[in-house]
């Protein structure tokens, strides 16, 4: 399948006006316009995921994050390796967080939540969180276990009340700011799930009386990238889609 056709398909999945207004939140870097037979996806663009793409002869990488400028030299290294091996790359940051098939929405649905509200507004445009409800309330340790099974990693959790958990705010990835937690509190949620925390996250959750669950940034967000890649597979059945291995290092 021609890369340009895959690019058109992917871009059509997002709000065009938001993409135009925030070009810093996404990119599609084409290495020519040859055929693409294999797509690899990961949360992060790192030397390790690029190496996985090279090893598996991937023609297009899809990630949630670009390589970070503040990890000095890493972005240049990744760009050089992609160019060297003729691998195209696209990333969608806030647009994927905002999408109904994106990071927080997909994690919420995977946990069995019925989404009832959007939350966690960023840049006055992108709703990066989702509030959902369980059909039947669950206990604290039950939710923690479900999240650990889903993410395949330990989940840190802080219990601030003894009520069963019915209503949950999910802000996958970097929802560590106290204003993110406040969105969950203002949304009358019993629990808040995210992928990063600081002292302030924990202290405010305790003060506000909301149960806090923290997985990793990488693996709370992978389900949205997986959904994006699956949509490419649905559109182009002949394309092979694979998950690129990422380590649990957080």
Regions found by a protein language model. Give the residues of each.
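Hydrophobic structural segments
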Residues: 1-250
């Amino acid at each position: 399948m021609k890369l340009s056709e895959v690019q058109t398909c992917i871009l059509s999945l997002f709000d065009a006006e938001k993409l135009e207004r925030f070009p810093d939140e996404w990119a599609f870097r084409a290495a020519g316009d040859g055929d693409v037979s294999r797509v690899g996806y990961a949360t992060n663009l790192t030397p390790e995921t690029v190496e996985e793409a090279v090893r598996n002869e991937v023609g297009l990488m899809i990630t949630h994050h670009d390589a970070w400028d503040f990890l000095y030299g890493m972005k240049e290294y990744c760009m050089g390796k992609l160019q060297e091996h003729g691998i195209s790359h696209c990333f969608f940051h806030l647009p994927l967080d905002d999408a109904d098939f994106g990071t927080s929405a997909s994690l919420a649905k995977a946990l069995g939540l019925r989404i009832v509200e959007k939350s966690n507004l960023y840049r006055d445009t992108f709703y990066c969180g989702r509030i959902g409800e369980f059909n039947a309330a669950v206990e604290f340790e039950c939710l923690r276990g479900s999240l650990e099974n889903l993410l395949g990693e330990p989940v840190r959790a802080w219990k601030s009340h003894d009520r069963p958990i019915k209503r949950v705010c999910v802000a996958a990835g970097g929802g560590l700011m106290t204003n993110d937690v406040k969105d969950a509190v203002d949304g009358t949620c019993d629990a808040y799930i995210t992928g990063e925390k600081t002292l302030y996250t924990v202290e405010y959750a305790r003060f506000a009386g909301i149960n806090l669950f923290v997985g990793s940034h990488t693996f709370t967000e992978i389900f949205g990238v997986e959904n994006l890649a699956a949509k490419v597979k649905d559109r182009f059945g002949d394309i092979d889609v694979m998950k690129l291995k990422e380590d649990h290092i957080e």
